[in-house]
């Protein structure tokens, strides 16, 4: 399990100072999702927390933020793993589940690893 918490304004200030930082941290899809919301920084902060929580849960030491992609669709967000994150999850034989939340001031996420027993993902 991994957890992360972030003050939203901290990320918003960092992105304002370094506009290209968003490209290093988030995929095109993640940035587009956030841009379509009233306060993009709130949604990017939750995704940043999810990436950190997944890295902690997997025990990653060297990884890229883009190795963990938060996918929003119907229902709860899911993660799509790439690079080192995907390799580590495969080596452990686990799937990753995330839960994201935010208030007006803070964002947080929890990542939980679970084993696949029959090749199918565990029920949600």
Regions found by a protein language model. Give the residues of each.
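Core catalytic alpha/beta fold that binds nucleotide/phospho-ligands
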Residues: 1-124
